[in-house]
């Protein structure tokens, strides 16, 4: 729900997290402040990459690792912006780096960690994109669970959109465990 027309990037969004209908900058203090963790992890990752010696005869994947580290930093900044400003443009600043990170890391996990070829990796990422695209729009069925009473609306306020990432994480984790990676 926004306060004005659907096409304005500065429209306020009041449908998410602990904000309610409070337009104040610090209406979501826990969500806003917790994003510092992403910034700290990104800085620590960049320092680690800078200090790690190159090993002769091994491929150097620093560019991809640095890109993922940059996305972690962008997640922290974008999420802070969304949870303080709560506008349409800040929502994109929040979700775009998260989506790019998920896709990039899933492709990395399939290709580098699990050893898939390029075609299976591409197909896996494409399937992941489709799952992400449609899972957040699954309508609630009244009476399914006590919290699904909003029949016809996206279930759990669209939070089912996170299920493909959780499933992918679990499947990759189990596969790595079975490979003893």
Per-region residue spans from a language model:
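Multi-pass alpha-helical transmembrane bundles in non-GPCR membrane proteins
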Residues: 2-181
